[in-house]
Amino acid sequence: MSGSSLPGALALSLLLVSGSLLPGPGAAQNAGFVKSPMSETKLTGDAFELYCDVVGSPTPEIQWWYAEVNRAESFRQLWDGARKRRVTVNTAYGSNGVSVLRITRLTLEDSGTYECRASNDPKRNDLRQNPSITWIRAQATISVLQKPRIVTSEEVIIRDSLLPVTLQCNLTSSSHTLMYSYWTKNGVELTATRKNASNMEYRINKPRAEDSGEYHCVYHFVSAPKANATIEVKAAPDITGHKRSENKNEGQDAMMYCKSVGYPHPEWMWRKKENGVFEEISNSSGRFFIINKENYTELNIVNLQITEDPGEYECNATNSIGSASVSTVLRVRSHLAPLWPFLGILAEIIILVVIIVVYEKRKRPDEVPDAGPMKTNSTNNHKDKNLRQRNTN
């Protein structure tokens, strides 16, 4: 072997050796965490969720374990439906493994250390193996504190009366220092309500359906999670927006909608007037599509038929307090309708031309037939002149 070929052969050998050490597409890969659970502090009655995301080849198995406070070595496995069905475990496996642990209606006994374990070791469930070697772990500490006691006024139902309404909250007991408090409606903070007070009031001077919803008095503390209480203000639906009429051409699509205020959110229903009576729409043709979103509903009709779809449509909103209905008139024109203005103009032009032609024919005088040249007085005068000249001679 020549000296020049020796380094090349050596490099090729090293490349083959190093290539054999690199993991291929189907090579095994140890489990590793992409996302680990995070520690939280909660109040009794609240809920928490812990997330765990792991990778590896093959996809690692995920388990959840729990240990009480100050007993970190006494872990017990958590199963879906445990603790009187307050525990929910949802796990999905694909290119990686993802699991969510959720516990609701928390009690003080739910405090402790929660552990996400993952492993793709073939012997991971062998009792003779040391779990600390075959499983990787990620821990989170959940601290559950006693929720402060908040006394609230009763729920309110808005009727036709416009008498003022006052909502009240009173923080009667708390082991933590209050920072500030405020009111929210449907999750949005109400302006000019933030203050440092345990007794809170919110006044609605002229209550209407649009004032209904979920009101919360929210308390923030120095070293504890915020606490809140709910007061429901209810009202019958009041439909505030809809189309009075909809004009479309045959073959087009039509969309009718209704918006309402009121709480609780209503159940929506669409009906069409048949023989003077509103009847619920039956989607036998498959051309009707209804979308309901809390205080909004939408009726879509595709490929309008001039013989079936025109008429009066009604949207109805109903909740536990009352109901409301409004109507929309749908008109469907023939697909030739866009040509009607053009045809009308063309007809007017034709009629105008005919009138002009007839008028011109009647206005023209009768034509005189040709009768040859006519004799004039000048000819006679010439004859008379000649006669005089002869007489003189």
UniProtKB/Swiss-Prot annotation:
Keyword annotations from UniProtKB, A to Z: Cell adhesion, Cell membrane, Disulfide bond, Glycoprotein, Immunoglobulin domain, Membrane, Neurogenesis, Repeat, Signal, Synapse, Transmembrane, Transmembrane helix
Expression (tissue specificity): Isoform 1 is ubiquitously expressed. Isoform 2 is brain-specific. In brain isoform 2 is highly expressed in hippocampus and cerebral cortex and weakly in cerebellum and lower brain regions. In the hippocampus isoform 2 is found in the dentate gyrus and CA1-CA4, the striatum oriens of CA3 shows the higher level.
Residues annotated as signal peptide: 1-28
UniProt keyword Membrane present: yes
Gene Ontology cellular component terms for the protein in this record: axon; cell surface; dendrite; GABA-ergic synapse; glutamatergic synapse; immunological synapse; inhibitory synapse; membrane
Gene3D superfamilies with a match to the protein in the record: Immunoglobulins
Pfam families: I-set, Ig_3
Biological role stated in the UniProt entry: Probable homophilic and heterophilic cell adhesion molecule involved in long term potentiation at hippocampal excitatory synapses through activation of p38MAPK. May also regulate neurite outgrowth by activating the FGFR1 signaling pathway. May play a role in synaptic plasticity. Also acts as a chaperone for ATP2B1; stabilizes ATP2B1 and increases its ATPase activity. Promotes localization of XKR8 at the cell membrane.
Stated name of the protein: Neuroplastin
Organism, as annotated: Rattus norvegicus (Rat)
